[in-house]
């Protein structure tokens, strides 16, 4: 529901093209969009029911701004600028760069070949990126041996080591003609562009000769070199008739998700591909999200623009081309059209795969939780809360609460309780008293703060715990939450549930679950998790209390001094190991530090 402030602004929206900036309660821009008609588009966010990611966005909007322009093309260019400026949360968020290295031929008087992960526009020739870093390093070493350029810092007045090894042309002590560099660079570029037939033939002959000469280590080195060349230079089969560097983008949309597939063609070969999947914020215009993605994609660090970008029909190619500064085309027939369709098919395949994996995951989460509710005869609920207690012969009693939402642990909602002990139940080991106390504290607070109650409470225990929990909920708090107990067998293994409501005259009954069902597995996960959480909390509490008790026995050490030591050292062992000076650094006086040292 829109606020009065937003409703008033909606009435003033113009029927013009432009961009809109959605803002949260802190005034931060959380989404940037564009439209041919700002009035219709912005109003649609607040005047119709939203689902998915768009619903999440609308819930956070507290204000918006608009910027009008004279054409849809201008709104597209402005949108890209605003997204780059504000990096809004609900716009497509791209990861920074691939991190893969390039082989660079530097643009210098005395050029060199090197591996780099940073691309400087117009600073040289770049080849890659190469996903196999080790193969790229080996290929670079091969280039430096076969077609050397400069390998040293240059101009040092004497030949460098690499010159003596034949891996440097000698810029270190003489002027190397530019024509010599140019000839070497042409050979390197041909090699990195895929002209490797002669190189492979020469290496194969050398490998064969080394084997015949029983130089097996040398033969193995050459074999590995051939493999690295194939991984970096010859990696893919030829799939096109021309050698234009081009990137191919296509997409597929389903269930408010978009899958984008990118093919990188270099020297008529498919060098690599990338897939991006993300939920759509504006499901009405997936084309806008697609085009915005492409524009942001090349704004990333180390992204090298190709000579041509191919996109499917229906895109604003002219505006996108203006942003990218390279031709953006839509092929109508032939190999390019086939590659575009292949990118679409791969995008669909990836999104279908994601949904299948989500479905399998749901069987173990939502599906498993539904099995538990069905077994208890309850309508499906999203939230389960579970309690367990821990103590050592009544000492340092604690309780722990874990929360599972739609079958998954929601650790941000976990809670820990140090039990104080009821008046009528002074024995801290008493399960009834512990259960009553923690249930009362938990749900009286939820009532006071008007927070949502769980759909089911699972007690780690049997009839005693369930009846104590129900007594507090029904008779003290007047809360009607279903409660079941997770019962273990004689071997301390999860066995079944116990369910009913004696406060309403219902008998507690054993509810079996199929041990091979997902619902049974979820029940054991909940029981194991709440037990783990309670035990871990108790160990820490007991250790801390034991340390405090030990320090309390030392004459002259009061609560303030004790807390200083606990903050500084954290454990009795570290306090014992500390010197008098270190104890004084914690804030103790010299007599106190000496007393602690002697007492421990």
UniProtKB/Swiss-Prot annotation:
KW Coiled coil (keyword) present: no
Gene Ontology terms: cellular component: cytoplasm; excinuclease repair complex
Residue ranges annotated for the UVR domain, each copy included: 197-232
Gene3D superfamilies linked: 5' to 3' exonuclease, C-terminal subdomain, GIY-YIG endonuclease, UVR domain, UvrC, RNAse H endonuclease domain
Pfam family, one: HHH_5
Entry's localization field: Cytoplasm
Keywords (A to Z) from UniProt: Cytoplasm, DNA damage, DNA excision, DNA repair, Excision nuclease, SOS response
Domain GIY-YIG: residue ranges: 15-92
Source superkingdom: Bacteria
One GO molecular-function entry: DNA binding
Biological processes annotated in GO: nucleotide-excision repair; SOS response
NCBIfam families: uvrC (TIGR00194)
Family under the similarity heading: Belongs to the UvrC family.
Assembly description: Interacts with UvrB in an incision complex.
Function comment: The UvrABC repair system catalyzes the recognition and processing of DNA lesions. UvrC both incises the 5' and 3' sides of the lesion. The N-terminal half is responsible for the 3' incision and the C-terminal half is responsible for the 5' incision.
Stored PANTHER family: UVRABC SYSTEM PROTEIN C, UVRC/OXIDOREDUCTASE
Protein name: UvrABC system protein C
Lineage: Bacteria, Bacillati, Bacillota, Bacilli, Lactobacillales
């Amino acid at each position: 529901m829109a606020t009065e402030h937003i409703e008033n602004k909606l009435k003033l929206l113009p029927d013009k093209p432009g961009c809109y900036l959605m803002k949260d309660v802190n005034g931060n821009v959380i989404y940037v969009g564009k439209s041919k008609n700002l009035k219709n588009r912005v109003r649609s966010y607040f005047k119709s029911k939203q689902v998915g990611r768009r619903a999440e966005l609308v819930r956070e909007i507290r204000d918006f701004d608009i910027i009008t322009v004279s054409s849809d093309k201008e709104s597209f260019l402005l949108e890209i600028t605003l997204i780059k400026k504000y990096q809004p949360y609900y716009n497509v968020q791209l990861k920074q760069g691939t991190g893969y290295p390039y082989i660079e031929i530097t643009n210098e008087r005395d050029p060199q070949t090197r591996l780099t992960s940073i691309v400087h526009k117009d600073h040289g020739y770049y080849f890659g990126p190469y996903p196999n870093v080790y193969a790229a390093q080996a290929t670079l070493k091969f280039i430096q041996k076969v077609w050397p350029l400069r390998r040293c810092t240059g101009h040092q007045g004497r030949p460098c080591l690499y010159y003596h090894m034949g891996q440097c042309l000698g810029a270190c002590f003489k002027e190397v003609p530019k024509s010599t560099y140019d000839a070497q660079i042409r050979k390197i570029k041909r090699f990195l562009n895929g002209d490797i037939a002669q190189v492979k033939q020469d290496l194969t002959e050398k490998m064969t000769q080394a084997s015949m000469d029983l130089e097996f280590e040398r033969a193995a080195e050459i074999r590995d070199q051939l493999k690295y060349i194939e991984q970096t230079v010859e990696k893919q089969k030829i799939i096109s008739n021309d050698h234009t560097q081009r990137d191919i983008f296509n997409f597929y949309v389903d269930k408010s998700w978009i899958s984008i597939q990118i093919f990188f063609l270099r020297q008529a070969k498919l060098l690599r591909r990338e897939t991006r999947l993300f939920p759509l914020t504006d499901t009405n215009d997936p084309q806008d999200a697609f085009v915005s993605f492409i524009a942001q994609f090349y704004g990333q660090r180390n992204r090298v623009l190709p000579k041509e970008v191919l996109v499917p029909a229906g895109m604003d190619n002219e505006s996108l081309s203006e942003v990218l500064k390279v031709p953006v085309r839509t092929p109508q027939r032939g190999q390019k059209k086939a590659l575009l369709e292949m990118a679409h098919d791969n995008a669909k395949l990836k999104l279908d795969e994601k949904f299948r994996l989500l479905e399998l995951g749901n069987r173990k989460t939502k599906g498993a939780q539904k099995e538990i509710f069905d077994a208890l005869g309850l309508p499906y609920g999203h939230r389960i809360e579970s309690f367990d207690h821990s103590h050592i012969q009544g000492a340092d009693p604690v309780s722990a609460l874990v929360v599972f939402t739609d079958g998954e642990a929601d650790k941000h909602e976990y809670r820990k309780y140090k039990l104080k002990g009821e008046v009528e139940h002074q024995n801290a080991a008493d399960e009834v008293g512990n259960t009553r106390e923690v249930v009362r504290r938990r749900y009286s607070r939820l009532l006071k703060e008007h927070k949502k109650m769980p759909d089911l409470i699972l007690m780690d225990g049997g009839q005693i715990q369930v009846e104590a929990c129900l007594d507090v909920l029904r008779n003290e708090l007047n809360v009607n939450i279903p409660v079941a107990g997770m019962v273990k067998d004689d071997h301390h293994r999860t066995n079944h549930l116990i369910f009913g409501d004696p406060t309403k005259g219902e008998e507690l009954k054993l509810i079996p679950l199929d041990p091979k069902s997902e619902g049974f597995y979820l029940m054991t996960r909940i029981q194991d998790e709440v037990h783990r959480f309670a035990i871990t909390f108790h160990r820490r509490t007991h250790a801390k209390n034991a340390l405090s008790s030990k320090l309390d026995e030392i004459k002259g050490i009061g609560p303030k001094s004790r807390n200083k030591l606990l903050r500084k050292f954290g454990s009795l062992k570290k306090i014992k190991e500390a010197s008098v000076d270190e104890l004084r650094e914690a804030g103790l006086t010299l007599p106190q530090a000496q007393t602690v040292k002697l007492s421990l």
